[in-house]
Curated annotation (Swiss-Prot):
The lineage of its organism: Eukaryota, Metazoa, Chordata, Craniata, Vertebrata. Pathway: Lipid metabolism; mitochondrial fatty acid beta-oxidation. The active site is at 401 (proton acceptor). It comes from the Eukaryota. Its cofactor is FAD. Belongs to the acyl-CoA dehydrogenase family. FAD binds at residues 158-167, 191-193, 306-308, 316-317, 374-378, 402-405. It comes from Rattus norvegicus. GO terms for cellular component: axon; cytoplasm; mitochondrial matrix; mitochondrial membrane; mitochondrion. Disulfide bonds: none annotated. This is Medium-chain specific acyl-CoA dehydrogenase, mitochondrial. Keywords: Acetylation, FAD, Fatty acid metabolism, Flavoprotein, Lipid metabolism, Mitochondrion, Oxidoreductase, Phosphoprotein, Transit peptide. The modification Phosphothreonine is found at residue 351. It catalyses: a medium-chain 2,3-saturated fatty acyl-CoA + oxidized [electron-transfer flavoprotein] + H(+) = a medium-chain (2E)-enoyl-CoA + reduced [electron-transfer flavoprotein]; pentanoyl-CoA + oxidized [electron-transfer flavoprotein] + H(+) = (2E)-pentenoyl-CoA + reduced [electron-transfer flavoprotein]; hexanoyl-CoA + oxidized [electron-transfer flavoprotein] + H(+) = (2E)-hexenoyl-CoA + reduced [electron-transfer flavoprotein]; octanoyl-CoA + oxidized [electron-transfer flavoprotein] + H(+) = (2E)-octenoyl-CoA + reduced [electron-transfer flavoprotein]. GO terms for molecular function: acyl-CoA dehydrogenase activity; flavin adenine dinucleotide binding; identical protein binding; isomerase activity; medium-chain fatty acyl-CoA dehydrogenase activity; protein homodimerization activity.
Length: 421
């Protein structure tokens, strides 16, 4: 483990029993004789959860409203998360990282999102940017680009979406042409999280101009240094929610990239880009659950304090039933991301469960944020109270990393295919 990470863990409590090895990061749905599985977390998972929870409640929540209003990038919080080992959790131990599984990353993500999903998204975007390198990079690429992120707080970004190609990834127009030992990239990317803060990018390009070539062979993925000549970073976008997250457009104009920065080889980019989602969609779902849990907690506390018609809100059946519905939804959404994470950590293809988790948790986050505002009444519509921010922040969970509708297409395809086979 990197020295900085060791120092970070000592900040909150002694965790000398942490060995941070992959075999110690099994999901909570572990096999038990006679029962089949258990919901009990390992001691290490409980430690990670405690550290993340303490950080979110004591350091993120107090400043989240200010970051939301200013739109300032939360680098002090990101640096602190890096010191505590709550960022770059997927990076292999061979590159100086913790080598945690998806399940463990989800536990951390839920806690961070409870504090502020804008901060959590800035952190989680690193995992998305890193994932193509983690699953498809060679040893040299991993050590060079992942290793540097364990040495100091550093960001990366996943550059796939374009102005005219969001859900239709196969419709991207950014091109890469091979010229000698280099590739020349030209095109534009849009809505790139960490776009203006990244040290390097994963960039998906069309390397075969023939429209008849299938997507599985037409695209190539590159690692591109952010300071490469020809890269032009656009203005920071002012979004409806998650405002402290850095979202920008990026233009590539005759950007030269060495052939050593190709992941796997020409034509492998589409599979790499899509494969990354199987590992990151569970954590996105976990972020949505963190927001949903916050909405439930805020609504419940308010209903226990606010009186109307001579009694507490919770004493009105309509409100208590609404809280019950909210509680059911958040518990089921949590189980959905845990199942998706458990599947991939167990070495199984989890596309079906990852899409279920992403779609369901994203919808639940929006429903619970709306319900929380309703319970707060007029106060919920005011910026002095936390739930209006939750409602604004929640919407993006139905859009980024695959819209709610795209997830349903994937779920339907996977479901029907099972019956065909």
């Amino acid at each position: 483990m990197a020295a900085a990470l060791r120092r970070g863990y000592k900040v909150l409590r002694s965790v000398s029993h942490f060995e941070c090895r992959a075999q110690h990061t099994k999901p909570s749905l572990k096999q038990e004789p006679g029962l089949g599985f258990s919901f009990e977390l390992t001691e290490q998972q409980k430690e990670f959860q405690t550290i993340a929870r303490k950080f979110a409640r004591e350091e993120i929540i107090p400043v989240a409203p200010d970051y939301d209003k200013s739109g300032e990038y939360p680098f002090p919080l990101i640096k602190r998360a890096w010191e505590l080992g709550l960022i770059n959790t997927h990076i292999p131990e061979s590159c100086g990282g913790l080598g945690l599984g998806t399940f463990d990353a989800c536990l951390i993500t839920e806690e961070l999102a409870y504090g502020c999903t804008g901060v959590q998204t800035a952190i989680e975007a690193n995992s998305l940017g890193q994932m193509p390198v983690i699953i498809a990079g060679n040893d040299q690429q991993k050590k060079k680009y992942l290793g540097r992120m364990t040495e100091q707080p550093m960001m990366c970004a996943y550059c796939v979406t374009e102005p005219s190609a969001g859900s239709d990834v196969a419709g991207i127009k950014t091109k890469a042409e091979k010229k000698g030992d280099e590739y020349v990239i030209n095109g534009q990317k849009m809505w790139i999280t960490n776009g203006g803060k990244a040290n390097w990018y994963f960039v998906l390009t069309r390397s075969n101009p023939d429209p008849k070539v299938p997507a599985s062979k037409a695209f190539t993925g590159f690692i591109v240094e952010a300071d490469t000549p020809g890269i032009h970073i656009g203005k920071k976008e002012l979004n409806m929610g998650q405002r402290c997250s850095d979202t920008r457009g990026i233009t590539f104009e005759d950007v030269r990239v060495p052939k050593e920065n190709v992941l796997i080889g020409e034509g492998a980019g589409f599979k790499i880009a899509m494969g990354a989602f199987d590992r990151t969609r569970p954590t996105v779902a976990a972020g949505a659950v963190g927001l949903a849990q916050r909405a439930l907690d805020e609504a419940t506390k308010y209903a226990l304090d606010r009186k109307t018609f001579g009694k507490l809100l919770v004493e009105h059946q309509g409100v208590s039933f609404l809280l019950a519905e909210m509680a059911m939804k958040v518990e089921l959404a949590r189980l959905s991301y845990q199942r998706a994470a458990w599947e991939v950590d167990s070495g199984r293809r989890n596309t079906y469960f990852a899409s279920i988790a992403k779609a369901f948790a994203g919808d639940i986050a929006n429903q619970l944020a709306t319900d929380a505002v309703q319970i707060f009444g007029g106060y919920g519509f005011n910026t002095e109270y936390p739930v209006e921010k939750l409602m604004r922040d929640a919407k993006i969970y139905q859009i980024y990393e695959g819209t709610a509708q795209i997830q349903r297409l994937i779920i339907a395809r996977e479901h029907i295919e099972k019956y065909k086979n």
